[in-house]
């Protein structure tokens, strides 16, 4: 029996979510969903991770964030569900930190992964004072 679960996430930015999936080398596809709100057509972009058993994993936009929808009993990814979420969250956060920091003039100069799986990113700015 199939039981799909919606997991609340903090993934709010499609660009960073796609970058995180790419870093984990997890293939996905974009899926546009038409929404007819107040007679004006809008589209949500959801991400689908195809699985060979046809129980695909999806990230559905709920208007605020991407919810992870999956059936854990049919999960066939290289990582267990909890590990997948942790790794994806870490790559997502790293991407947000680096991208947003670059917008204000910082560049990553060092990145270190610790034994516990956490990362430390060192940022610097090349601002010269006269």
From Swiss-Prot:
Pfam families: DUF1257. Its main location: plastid. One of its GO terms (cellular component) is chloroplast. It is found in: Plastid, Chloroplast. Keywords: Chloroplast, Plastid. PANTHER family: YCF35 (PTHR39638:SF2). Belongs to the ycf35 family. This is Uncharacterized protein ycf35. It comes from Skeletonema costatum (Marine centric diatom).
């Amino acid at each position: 029996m199939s039981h799909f679960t919606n997991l609340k996430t903090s993934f709010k930015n499609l660009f960073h979510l796609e970058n995180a999936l790419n870093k984990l080398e997890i293939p996905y596809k974009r899926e546009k969903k038409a929404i007819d709100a107040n007679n004006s057509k809008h589209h949500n972009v959801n991400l689908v991770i195809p699985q060979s058993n046809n129980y695909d994993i999806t990230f559905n936009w709920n208007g605020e964030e991407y919810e992870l929808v999956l059936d854990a009993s049919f999960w066939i990814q290289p990582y267990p569900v909890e590990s997948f979420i942790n790794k994806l969250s870490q790559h997502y956060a790293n991407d947000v930190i680096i991208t947003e920091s670059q917008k204000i003039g910082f560049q990553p100069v060092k990145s270190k992964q610790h034994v516990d799986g956490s990362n430390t990113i060192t940022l610097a700015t090349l601002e010269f004072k006269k």
